[in-house]
Regions:
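Well-structured core secondary-structure elements of compact alpha/beta domains
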Residues: 1-5, 17-63, 73-99, 125-170
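Append "and occasionally in soluble cytosolic enzymes with long acidic Gly/Pro-rich linkers
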Residues: 12-15
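Cell-wall glycan
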Residues: 96-109
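Short terminal targeting/anchoring segments
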Residues: 105, 168-173
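Short acidic-hydrophobic surface loop/beta-edge motif
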Residues: 113-119
Length: 173
């Protein structure tokens, strides 16, 4: 049934214009971070020591912001980003631990560095390194997926009609 269906450009455009929220690419942030580990259940002495180390690293960053990546390589305890100078790449909301994400999305300009923040993993220093604003994906980029969706929807409707017709025919006999 679906192979026989043709969806017109006007129908595709109408769907795109009627539901722009479905075709938005969420804002993303690129950040680097330095993690000084102090797991959630760590004792007070471990937490105090980790906070002090994070504060000392932040002081070095404030003295020379260009050293962030170098300081991340030397001090961060995040195995996934340390070798990359703390770079976490671009991420949307919902992809990182809440404290880190809220801080990254709370920074207002590229190059801005946060104060020391705490998460379940320890203490972080976040540097905002990029922002991709929310955008409406271009029609040409989503045209084929809208067409496929409209075809599936129409095929399901036609299939239901055929089943009803078949059921009625069988019932009448």
């Amino acid at each position: 049934v679906a192979d026989q269906l043709v969806v017109g450009d006007a129908d595709i455009r109408k769907e795109y214009d009627a539901h722009p929220e479905r075709f938005r690419q969420a804002e993303e942030r690129r950040a680097s971070h330095i993690l000084i580990q102090a797991d959630k259940g760590a004792g007070d002495a471990v937490i105090k020591s980790a906070r002090e180390k994070a504060e000392a690293v932040l002081k070095q960053i404030k003295a020379n912001p260009a050293d962030f990546a170098k300081l991340a390589k030397e001090n961060s305890q995040d195995p996934g980003s340390t070798e990359k100078g703390g770079d976490l790449g671009f991420f949307p909301r919902g992809a990182m631990v809440k404290a880190l994400e809220d801080t990254a999305f709370g920074l207002s300009r590229e190059g801005e560095v946060s104060e020391v923040i705490q998460s379940d993993f320890g203490f972080h220093i976040i540097k905002l390194t990029g922002v991709k604003a929310e955008v409406l994906r271009p029609f040409g980029e989503v045209r084929n997926e809208i067409a496929a969706e409209l075809k599936r929807s129409e095929a399901a409707r036609k299939f239901a009609e055929l089943v009803d017709g078949f059921t009625n025919t069988v019932y009448e006999q």
